[in-house]
Amino acid sequence: MKSVSYTHLNKSENYNLSVDKKEDFYYLDCKDEAIGAILKKLPHASLEVEPCHVTENKVQVNIPENLDASVAKSGMWEEYDSRCIACGRCNFVCPTCTCFTMQDLFYSENGKVGERKRVWASCMVDGFTDVAGGGSYRRKNGERMRFKVLHKVWDYKERNGYHMCVGCGRCDDICPEYISFSNCINKLGKAMEEVSQS
């Protein structure tokens, strides 16, 4: 199985102030004149400073090149039925999640007036896929996790040519159940092997 590894680095020259702590000292690189004027008034040693940048991600994510819709049939998603609590925190910190829902608000002062609002929502919370008549497309948390993961790394790429996930790791950091989106993506290779053998 061949896989593609994605490493996003944050090296940039586009900053006003860089602050790096090394041992007990702070090293500043200032490009902003206003901030520089304030810093010059403080007692400090003037050094040539090269800001520290991330040069390698601690977690490598490998997305199988042969990834397709059949991975949805893998048993790996059942793990998330019990682990995920459907809080939606992973979605709300994600810079690429843009799901929304509509809410109709009625005012008690005047029953003839109301408001329809577009509200940020989460595909991971209960009720997001509810439809008229009491139906719901994804009732189990594992089904929601499957949808989110495949939307980020498979279906979005099929439509747009690149993965939706930017690799920031915010979802890993915020999850109260310590579910790692990165680890989930890394399990896709074995999941593809599983479904190809069945």
Where are each of the predicted segments found?
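Long, compositionally biased charged/polar accessory segments in the mid-to-C-terminal portions
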Residues: 21-32
